[in-house]
UniProtKB/Swiss-Prot annotation:
Protein name according to UniProt: Cytochrome c oxidase subunit 6A1, mitochondrial
GO molecular function: oxidoreductase activity
Topology feature Mitochondrial intermembrane, residues: 62-111
Organism of derivation: Mus musculus
Transit peptide as recorded in UniProt: 1-26
Subunit structure: Component of the cytochrome c oxidase (complex IV, CIV), a multisubunit enzyme composed of 14 subunits. The complex is composed of a catalytic core of 3 subunits MT-CO1, MT-CO2 and MT-CO3, encoded in the mitochondrial DNA, and 11 supernumerary subunits COX4I, COX5A, COX5B, COX6A, COX6B, COX6C, COX7A, COX7B, COX7C, COX8 and NDUFA4, which are encoded in the nuclear genome.
Pathway connected to this protein: Energy metabolism; oxidative phosphorylation
Family: Belongs to the cytochrome c oxidase subunit 6A family.
Membrane-spanning residues: 37-61
Keyword field contains Oxidoreductase: yes
Length: 111
């Protein structure tokens, strides 16, 4: 029994030295990573940086756009229902209330 194990190890040892990449063929480390860094560098230069540039252009063009008029207030019965007051402030304003954009149940505060 011991001689069979010894002979098997003698046969497998040279194979392991000759083919180191085939030792664990299903592991993720078996594949070469020489192209991985080059791929991520190319993605950074050709996808990410132009994407940031397009986003900056979009913000610039939107900032130069004229202001729109506020739509007239229509008191729809299914919107802005207050069954109990909010636990902050006067209880009628939402947490991130903007008086120029968000109307109260009675209308805009500015009008």
């Amino acid at each position: 029994m011991a001689s069979a194990v010894l002979s098997a190890s003698r046969v497998s040892r040279p194979l392991g030295r000759a083919l180191p990449g085939l030792r664990r063929p299903m592991s993720s480390g078996a594949h070469g990573e020489e192209g991985s860094a080059r791929m991520w560098k190319a993605l950074t230069y050709f996808v990410a940086l132009p994407g940031v540039g397009v986003s900056m252009l979009n913000v610039f063009l939107k900032s130069r756009h004229e202001e729109h008029e506020r739509p007239p207030f229509v008191a729809y019965p299914h919107l802005r229902i207050r069954t109990k007051p909010f636990p902050w402030g006067d209880g009628n304003h939402t947490l991130f209330h903007n008086p120029h954009v968000n109307p109260l149940p009675t209308g805009y505060e500015d009008e």
